[in-house]
Curated annotation (Swiss-Prot):
The record marks 103 as: Transition state stabilizer. Its cofactor is Mg(2+). The gene is recU. It is an enzyme of class 3 (hydrolase). Its main location: cytoplasm. This is Holliday junction resolvase RecU. GO terms for molecular function: endonuclease activity; magnesium ion binding; nucleic acid binding. It is found in: Cytoplasm. It catalyses: Endonucleolytic cleavage at a junction such as a reciprocal single-stranded crossover between two homologous DNA duplexes (Holliday junction).
Length: 208
């Protein structure tokens, strides 16, 4: 099935392979899973112990071509995303609304702002105005380092670009203004540790 973005470009989710077997490279921690897969597993764990309710957002799709090889079966051949996606995940934790994006890079010294889109930045702005807890889970794959980075800081970096600001966020700034995560067995990515830090910073609550 071919799925297209609103601008007509074909969508590639990394799950379509040639007939030859292709092994997925180990991106981080020797597990061979993508950042998104690890976050999905972590969210399942958090839900199983009733600690947080967080899900990956579904993306609306408009079906434009369907084949019926059998009367009782339908095969979708072509579809389009109805609207640009906002962010990857949202949910509730400790009474706070969470909204966040997951990004990774092979760069060692900085994180490129081109990995974000204007509509995602505007979505973060709107959520922050409603007192949401908004952030990005950033992975430096080559360095094997993982951070929770506040959306407010991301927006500041984004807004400085037209005035000659950097096109990337230096790693040292992410270390200074973010919260470093340390992968473990369960959950794989303990991102709620970073959320606790954001909540403390925002409202002065004591962790736990």
């Amino acid at each position: 099935m071919t799925i297209h973005y609103p601008n007509g470009n074909p969508y590639k989710d990394g799950t379509q392979f040639s007939s030859q077997a292709i092994s997925r490279p180990t991106i981080y921690g020797g597990r061979g899973m993508t950042l998104e897969e690890e976050l999905n597993i972590s969210n399942q764990y958090y839900r199983s112990i009733d600690k947080a309710v967080v899900y990956k957002k579904p993306t609306p799709v408009q079906i434009v071509k369907v084949d019926y090889p059998k009367r009782s079966q339908a095969v979708i051949r072509e579809a389009y995303f109805k609207t640009p996606s906002t962010t990857d995940y949202n949910g509730v934790y400790r009474g706070f609304y969470l909204d966040f994006e997951a990004k990774e890079t092979k760069n060692k010294a900085s994180f490129p702002l081109k990995n974000f889109h204007q509509h995602q930045i505007e979505h973060f702005r709107r959520c922050l105005k409603q007192s949401g807890i908004c952030f990005v889970v950033i992975r430096f794959a080559t360095l094997k380092r993982l951070f929770v980075f506040p959306a407010g800081r991301l927006i500041d970096c984004w807004d400085r670009q037209p005035d000659g600001g950097r096109k990337s966020i230096p790693l040292k700034d992410i270390v200074t203004n973010g919260f470093e995560l340390h992968p473990q067995l369960q959950p794989v990515i303990p991102f709620l540790d970073g959320v606790d830090w954001l909540i403390e910073t925002k409202v002065g609550n004591v962790r736990g």
